[in-house]
């Protein structure tokens, strides 16, 4: 990775930082909301991609997202301040993810994906069947507004956490984890021959990925003021990070962020134009894009420069 390769990523963050300070007019609150959820989608996609780099195609991200949201809400109910509740909810999610990682250690491919999907359903069922005075049951749970409902502040916090996620991703790509993950992805037997501790590194990938996804869940809970098992643990929250990463470009830092930005804007545009049928058109556009761009949007960028991947 070279300094040139980091330029597009730096440009993205400069533009994203300037966005909330632009004269957005009467639609300012609406545009900030779109920007906020775009950043959350970027965190989810990038956190999923970090796990995928170790060869694990997970469908448990809805569980990590939901555990972060519910963990944060329950910690706030104890009187804990949000700056403490946020990292603690993410840390708790990371610790629980290690259990999932240990249990599914011998699985791969379709069997691993099914196991992680089942884990999400188990967590959702547990949350839904907790006493209503604890987690709200199937009816959901009210959550205090993050930063008192300040839209600009919420956006900037989401941008900060996306920057943190990008920093972690870059550290993974340039450190020992990168080589270990690549070896495991090529084949665990080969990785063991090379001296890679597959168990340790796969669990590390689980912890890092789930911690970051939980932060996205915290942002969601604090922005929407309300969480429910069906919405928070929905299958869409497991599928979206996967498709976004593929669309943007796997095993890169900029790719999932770029994918989240393009898809979120496209979703809003189609919703305004096509109305009720926008999801069908959105799905077709996404499917065709993946077929025509097997290396994602990053594949297009690579054609125009030779500075390496980000």
Ranges and model annotations:
Residues 1-17, 186-203, 269-310:
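Cytosolic-side transmembrane-helix boundaries in multi-pass membrane proteins
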Residues 37, 41, 69-70, 90-94, ...:
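Residue-level recognition of pore/gate-forming positions within transmembrane alpha-helices
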Residues 28-77, 103-112, 190, 249-253:
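Single transmembrane alpha-helix segments in multi-pass membrane proteins
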Residues 1-42, 79-85, 309-310:
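Membrane-interfacial amphipathic/re-entrant helices at transmembrane-helix boundaries
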Residues 149-229:
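Helix-loop-helix "hairpin" substructures at the membrane interface of multi-pass membrane proteins
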Residues 206-288, 292:
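Transmembrane alpha-helical segments in multi-pass inner-membrane proteins
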